Amino acid sequence: QLGTPISSLMAWTEILKETYPKDDLIPEMDKDVKRLQLIADRFSKIGSQPELVPSSLNQIMDHVFDYMDRRTSQSIKIMKEMPVHDLIVTINASLFEWVIENLAKNAVDAMGGKAGVITLHVEEEAGKAVIEVSDTGKGIKKKDIGNVFRPGFTTKKRGWGLGLSLARRIVEEYHHGKICVKSSEVGKGTTFRIELKL
């Protein structure tokens, strides 16, 4: 159902590129429309059993880092802590990338427009790939930690509160992994942790 309006947007951006070949904003618009197509494709996989294939975790984290780094305020520093050797995990790369991106976007929101640091950390631990997304944002109240993965739970003024609920479904049901709030302190920040079998 999303395909038709997205195809329309793609056609319009092609026309704009031809009409205004020197405009710097049109290639960015084109990237965002292509990204919208990718997201629509990802969501069409929800409900059906997605195909899992051996994929480079380092490459996925690089994609998320590059995407977030280009679209995040300069007052927020995004850092990567990766193992020297590549970790290969059996996943659906586009869905899993969406999960990490969603955690990173939540981390940006947690800063509330202030300066801070987001860290994307990957390591191998006891036959598992461990991914942690940490921020120095506002933190989650203790009473709310148990609810963050519940559909509809949100502390934001806009949005439906479905991101973390969907992230848990993708990690735990489709990838047989684990996702949790590793730690959170009000005024100091939050760390989300994902574990996947290698």
Where are these regions (language model features)?
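Glycine-rich ATP-binding loops of the HATPase_c
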Residues: 175-183
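Short alpha-helical Gxxx[C/S/T] motif in the catalytic ATP-binding
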Residues: 163, 167
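Detector for a conserved hydrophobic position within an alpha-helical segment of the HATPase_c
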Residues: 171-172
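Acidic ATP/Mg2+-coordinating residue in the GHKL
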Residues: 135
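Short conserved segment of the HATPase_c
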Residues: 140-151
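Short beta-strand/loop element within the Bergerat-fold HATPase_c
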Residues: 117-127
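Conserved catalytic submotifs in the C-terminal HATPase_c
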Residues: 77-88
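Conserved DHp (HisKA) dimerization/phosphotransfer helix of two-component histidine kinases, i.e.
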Residues: 8, 23-75
